[in-house]
Design a protein with these regions (language model features):
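Charged, terminal alpha-helix-loop-beta segments
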Residues: 1-211
Length: 211
């Protein structure tokens, strides 16, 4: 990759790794939490983060949970690189499927607020300074209602979506996700690449499945 400073002088951009940048999985997760539009492919798409590190019935933790502009619950699982995927006790995609199954039981926006969004707001209370006189439940309800109105959402959680994010994927994950897609499971893989340009770090995100 190059940056074109003038017509005849392209400057190469150095590809690096999150490990070389001393960035951990939680750092990537936090970057996406605060900038979730990085995973939206078009201007028409949008997501609202409603949960982080949410525990399911098996005591597992999902990285990020969102609602999209169609009212679907989106489970976002993050791994730093292929090594992190390989070192897991269970396949990357199976972990996300279990979390999606637990979110499928949410039948109303009030359940979403009570079980996920209000605890998330409480955890990140410092980010909601304009609503400091409201309870976490009141803030979550207001933010969710605003998002639903803005996106003209008429259905809630009719479908669940899974998004896997990593700087690289192993063949097992790629094959499994491709098969799940062919069997109508809404699951996507996004590859995230860090680049270094002088003292700046550039991030490039590419959807690799489905194409």
């Amino acid at each position: 990759m190059y940056i074109l400073e003038n017509k005849n002088q392209p400057t190469p951009i150095e590809e690096t790794t999150f490990a070389d940048l001393n960035m951990l999985e939680r750092d990537i997760e936090e970057m996406l939490r605060l900038n979730i539009d990085m995973l939206c492919e078009t201007d028409e798409e949008s997501m609202l983060i409603v949960g982080q590190q949410v525990r399911n019935e098996q005591n597992g933790r999902s990285d990020l949970t969102a609602i999209d502009n169609s009212g679907n619950i989106v489970l976002i699982e993050v791994k730093r690189d292929v090594n992190d995927i390989a070192n897991r006790k269970e396949p990357f995609e199976f972990q996300a499927i279990r979390y999606a199954a637990s979110c499928a039981t949410l039948k109303s926006t009030s359940e979403l607020v009570q079980n996920l969004f209000a605890p998330y707001v409480e955890k990140h209370r410092s980010e909601f300074t304009k609503e400091q006189n409201l309870t976490a439940t009141e803030i979550a309800t207001r933010k969710l209602d605003e998002f639903i109105k803005q996106c003209n959402i008429t259905e809630f959680n009719e479908h669940q979506k899974i998004v896997l994010v990593a700087s690289g994927f192993d063949e097992q994950t790629i094959s499994a996700v491709a098969w799940l897609n062919s069997n109508k499971v809404d699951i996507s893989c996004y590859q995230i690449f860090p680049y270094r340009l002088n003292d700046e770090i550039l991030i490039y995100i590419k959807k690799i499945i489905p194409i």
